[in-house]
Amino acid sequence: MIKLTVSHHKLTASGHALFAKKGQDIVCAAVSGIIFGALPWFETNSIAVQEDATVPSLSLELVQPTAKLITGLSVVIMQLKTLAHSYPQFISFEDQRKDE
């Protein structure tokens, strides 16, 4: 299962969807496409990106939040949340912002 966690100005993604065998997993491809498609924009706008090579994991964190950066991260979060609602057995989505 892919685990997506959203906290104040931060998104963390980890795990595998296991929707289908390697190379045919459309759920994993969709999540990866959203996140990795946005990475160049995030990296050019001073967002801290951390990857863990030992496990499939990635964190995006707004170092100096601005309205532009918050909007960009919000768009990515909304896309991922939509996928999680469509594939709840393969993607967990935890929004910790409501607890802050």
From Swiss-Prot:
The keyword Magnesium does not apply. Transmembrane segments: none annotated. InterPro entries: Peptidase_Prp, Peptidase_Prp_sf. One of its GO terms (molecular function) is cysteine-type peptidase activity. The keyword Protein transport does not apply. The active site is at H16 (proton donor), C28 (nucleophile). Its EC number is 3.4.22.-. Keywords: Hydrolase, Protease, Ribosome biogenesis, Thiol protease. One of its GO terms (biological process) is proteolysis. Coiled coil: none annotated. Homodimer. An essential cysteine protease that cleaves the N-terminus from ribosomal protein bL27. Belongs to the Prp family. This is Ribosomal processing cysteine protease Prp. It comes from Mycoplasma pneumoniae (strain ATCC 29342 / M129 / Subtype 1) (Mycoplasmoides pneumoniae). The lineage of its organism: Bacteria, Bacillati, Mycoplasmatota, Mycoplasmoidales, Mycoplasmoidaceae.
